[in-house]
Design a protein with these regions (language model features):
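Sequence context surrounding c-type heme c attachment/ligation sites in exported
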Residues: 23-145
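Bacterial N-terminal signal peptides that target proteins for export
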Residues: 1-8
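Sec/Tat signal peptide C-region and signal peptidase I cleavage site
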Residues: 18-22
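Bacterial N-terminal signal peptides
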Residues: 9-17
Length: 145
């Protein structure tokens, strides 16, 4: 499985899990919905062509990229966009959480790649994502409750 496919699979798994119970499913951030509408015809262009400084997921359509940022990251960590981003300077890399998120994406890809190589599990369905560890909190739980 390619790193991009592993990332997309993990994000889709997260989105599916969140939407499984529509009453409990988090609603899309109104700001993200507005941004997607403002994209107009650029919504289906690759994120790397639409946004500045996209280093990972460059080929993901811009509208899906924003939804991944919203559901896959913001909601998975229980934060707002400005936790990682400087508002109105989204491309800026000065915040440590944004740089850490990139490292975590690479770690997630590596784990998902190795999950796909395991022979004693259903590797087609096995995937980890941000929610796997973070569960809505910035700091993952390090012990069972």
């Amino acid at each position: 499985m390619t790193p991009m496919r592993a990332t997309i699979a993990a994000v889709l798994l997260t989105l599916f899990a969140i939407s499984a119970n529509s009453e409990d499913a988090p609603k899309e951030n109104a700001y993200v919905t507005e941004l997607i509408q403002q994209l107009g015809p650029n919504a289906k262009k690759p994120a790397g062509e639409v946004f500045k400084n996209v280093q990972l997921m460059k080929d993901v359509p811009a509208d899906r990229f924003l939804r991944i940022m919203d559901t896959g990251y913001r909601q998975s960590l229980g934060v707002s966009c400005d936790y990682c981003h400087v508002e109105d300077r989204w491309e800026a890399d000065e915040k440590r959480p944004k740089r850490a998120a990139r490292e975590m994406i690479l770690m997630m890809r590596m784990i998902n790649k190795h999950l796909g190589e395991l022979t004693e599990i259903d590797s087609q369905a096995a995937a980890v994502n941000c929610t796997t560890c973070h569960r809505g909190y910035v700091k993952p739980a390090l012990q069972m409750r």
